[in-house]
Design a protein with these regions (language model features):
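A domain-level signal for the structural core that forms small-molecule/cofactor-binding pockets
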Residues: 1-63
Length: 63
């Protein structure tokens, strides 16, 4: 079973997570020819205080 892992800042709600998982699964299935049912998608959410961009905390960059 193919696994898609995404590291990202905390998403605002369940609906956004669902759309992301559906989109990733669909794109991967179309690209590889592997059935959507075979894909596992893991979302690793991190607080914005734990992410740095250009030497700054993401929480300071996104308000």
């Amino acid at each position: 079973m193919p696994v898609i892992t995404v590291d990202l800042a905390v998403l605002p709600d369940r609906a956004v997570k669902q759309r992301l998982i559906e989109s990733l699964t669909s794109a991967a299935s179309q690209s590889t020819g592997i059935a959507e049912e075979k894909f596992i998608v893991l979302l690793n959410e991190m607080p914005r205080d734990n992410i740095g961009v250009g030497g700054k905390l993401l929480s300071d960059l996104v308000k």
